[in-house]
Amino acid sequence: MNTALAQQIANEGGVEAWMIAQQHKSLLRFLTCGSVDDGKSTLIGRLLHDTRQIYEDQLSSLHNDSKRHGTQGEKLDLALLVDGLQAEREQGITIDVAYRYFSTEKRKFIIADTPGHEQYTRNMATGASTCELAILLIDARKGVLDQTRRHSFISTLLGIKHLVVAINKMDLVDYSEETFTRIREDYLTFAGQLPGNLDIRFVPLSALEGDNVASQSESMSWYSGPTLLEVLETVEIQRVVDAQPMRFPVQYVNRPNLDFRGYAGTLASGRVEVGQRVKVLPSGVESNVARIVTFDGDREEAFAGEAITLVLTDEIDISRGDLLLAADEALPAVQSASVDVVWMAEQPLSPGQSYDIKIAGKKTRARVDGIRYQVDINNLTQREVENLPLNGIGLVDLTFDEPLVLDRYQQNPVTGGLIFIDRLSNVTVGAGMVHEPKNEAAVASSEFSAFELELNALVRRHFPHWGARDLLGDK
């Protein structure tokens, strides 16, 4: 039994009242990243321990596991709370992305513990894709390392605007203010090259001893700032998608009987309300929203992030992968785009290759036209390469088999984020963030109807021996 949880339930007046209170708390998704052995898993274990989120049987098991697999001598090895794979415990490292959940009186949290080894950079990118804040751990003895730079760049590339630089293991440098100041200046020098307007904060701490994690450290009187937990509880997260135009990717056509046809999905951005005039892309057909159906009943309006089913006043042809948006918005379909890519496969990405891609519920095919550059993570410079290797990050030009409706990833991660799928093995081999959609298709779309463009793409895909010309360009 978790005595802290039992006390919270008692204070709220019962389980139902406690659950209602939990629903109204804000949620923060964050990840821990940095170089190997910087103490990421230990930090999460310390957060769970000091916020009293560990059940008594877990604590008892942790004592036994610390004796068997622990790396901290007689002390509790808090990293074992997160490192669940047998290989992780044997090697004392994190391999997979581990998710943990906890809450305080002020906020709920979802933590993604990501691996520090370079060969698991792809796992780190997966964990960062859903987070709003990144905790970058730096070993006070080692300072800023290559993997620290790599994870910082990937975090900002994936749209994370809030970075908390946690300078860990301060106990091993005698809680030196000089060491903290030097590392802080080194990181700020590097961070000046990172894209975007970033909110960067620094906290000196010791995850092993608990200094400045959930309570102020008595050993660092020179630091008067907030603890790590206080930063997490008070940071203001402004979701970009709330202020963006309406985007509703259709994931499923719900047809339980002859009297109901609804289009289910998650509202990617903006808001939608009953009576609103909407447009379906790529067909361009317009209709009005008749109902907004949810698990809890009909609603008059819905907001970004909510799972809903839309019922329209007209029966029109809509299928999985189509996109609904406000009728008065002009968003041309494009057939090519420049995409920031994090490559995740042993086989490198090379020009001329074709892959299946998935974006916002739609599956199609894309060809790699060229690689503009690969980013050198050490100094964030760009260099020309012939292919993009495993864990490589670069800007790639893609051409799609059919016109797609895309947003820039920084504006909308749902309609601007895609994955590459190997056509033979069906394995995900890369992640892409749309850098800039190319508008050549806008001209062609004005010359040909949506039906003509779709028919042209269908003929070229299934009957290539006919030699049909691409209506969107000579390809």
UniProtKB/Swiss-Prot annotation:
GO MF entries: ATP binding; GTP binding; GTPase activity; sulfate adenylyltransferase (ATP) activity
UniProt-listed SUPFAM superfamilies: EF-Tu/eEF-1alpha/eIF2-gamma C-terminal domain, P-loop containing nucleoside triphosphate hydrolases, Translation proteins
Region G1, annotated ranges: 34-41
Chain segments carrying region G5: 206-208
Domain of life where this protein originates: Bacteria
Region annotation (G3) ranges: 113-116
UniProt key word GTP-binding: yes
Positions that bind GTP: 34-41, 113-117, 168-171
Region (G2): 92-96
E.C. designation(s): 2.7.7.4
UniProt-listed Gene3D superfamilies: P-loop containing nucleotide triphosphate hydrolases, Translation factors
Reaction catalysis annotation: sulfate + ATP + H(+) = adenosine 5'-phosphosulfate + diphosphate
Pathway: Sulfur metabolism; hydrogen sulfide biosynthesis; sulfite from sulfate: step 1/3
GO biological process, one term: sulfate assimilation
UniProtKB keywords: ATP-binding, GTP-binding, Nucleotide-binding, Nucleotidyltransferase, Transferase
Family (UniProt): Belongs to the TRAFAC class translation factor GTPase superfamily. Classic translation factor GTPase family. CysN/NodQ subfamily.
UniProt-listed NCBIfam families: CysN (TIGR02034), PRK05124.1 (NF003478), small_GTP (TIGR00231)
Role this protein plays: With CysD forms the ATP sulfurylase (ATPS) that catalyzes the adenylation of sulfate producing adenosine 5'-phosphosulfate (APS) and diphosphate, the first enzymatic step in sulfur assimilation pathway. APS synthesis involves the formation of a high-energy phosphoric-sulfuric acid anhydride bond driven by GTP hydrolysis by CysN coupled to ATP hydrolysis by CysD.
Protein name per its UniProtKB record: Sulfate adenylyltransferase subunit 1
Gene source species: Shigella boydii serotype 18 (strain CDC 3083-94 / BS512)
Gene name as annotated: cysN
